């Protein structure tokens, strides 16, 4: 029975008296998704083999054979010729079996001093480190596209909103720079997350370490890690780094989703602030006139998908005792899907933003509604000596009067403003120059400080952001 089981290919089959059922094989196998780690598995194995040879644990000739075999396997994987087998369960055993078929006993010696527990933890970290670097680069591409659009619209005025009600005029460039700030923080978070990803678990073996005289620091250097995980139990069971990545990815998608929501609103014919290029939109199977902003809508939807992966992995980890448990096999698909979602989203948005057509006349017309310069009038009165709360109340009276007259503050004469302000003997604080603060241009220009919406400040912020890129 033992020899019969051994032919089945399980690395542990000699322990059992009957073969695994086909249903259980399918249920427990991970090869059809974790094969994505194959090239990183080879990278880690080559570094491990080099360490084993350096330490005299295996012969140099065996190391050379392992390298020869792995080089061939890498080529087979890259060309699509490698045959992945369900019976071999996962990426690690598939590669090891092929290596042994190619180089014989040298391949059987590769697993000396390690376990699949520390092996897979190493593979995931190598893969995730690479993906983080790609995501940081894509965030840079998107920020660059936003900066270009912001620079073109540093003077374009639109209404700023709170509660989706007109609040104060801002420039479109300033509005876009808010997203540059968000995506800059996202890049910083990813870079910080990378620091904790970039620790080597290999050498922890199954959970307790190994009795072989290994050199973990050598392997860490070979693989570009900043150092080693300091506790073997934690090294094989830790998925904090994966959860942290999913949290950072969720914030990226949060910011994409907020931007998407605004794009959808701005593109609505009822608003008409922008148009999105046709190649990022779809039509309707029944309504011939439709041009739907499907890309931002779908990005908004995919954000919930990424949130789900974060919640799923947190739930996966919350009840596990030390050390490694089979539950952890479920850590990979959420990571893989999140990376694919974030990468595709950032690529598409970096391509979509340069093609956004801005409609400044519509933006300006909207900013002229809703008393967007009311705060400027209050500030005008404060600068003439009125306490802010009194100024606030006076302007509120004026706004109410404008509501009744169906006009804007700027439409009232100086005398009318004095009359409706309710200021009584202080109404003379409203001078003949009052209309200068009720213009959109005057309003945005007055916010001329770091972080303000004045065009000069927007251009300075753009220059600083370009330098940071």
Swiss-Prot record:
GO cellular component: cytosol
UniProt-listed GO biological process terms: arginine biosynthetic process via ornithine; L-arginine biosynthetic process
Keyword Amino-acid biosynthesis annotated: yes
Cited InterPro entries: Arg_succ_lyase_C, Argininosuccinate_lyase, Fumarase/histidase_N, Fumarate_lyase_CS, Fumarate_lyase_fam, Fumarate_lyase_N, L-Aspartase-like
Catalyzed reactions per annotation: 2-(N(omega)-L-arginino)succinate = fumarate + L-arginine
Keywords: Amino-acid biosynthesis, Arginine biosynthesis, Cytoplasm, Lyase
Any Pfam family the entry gives: ASL_C2
Enzyme kind, highest EC tier: lyase
GO molecular function, one term: argininosuccinate lyase activity
UniProt pathway annotation: Amino-acid biosynthesis; L-arginine biosynthesis; L-arginine from L-ornithine and carbamoyl phosphate: step 3/3
Family statement drawn from the similarity comment of this UniProt entry: Belongs to the lyase 1 family. Argininosuccinate lyase subfamily.
Protein name as it appears in the record: Argininosuccinate lyase
Gene name in the database record: argH
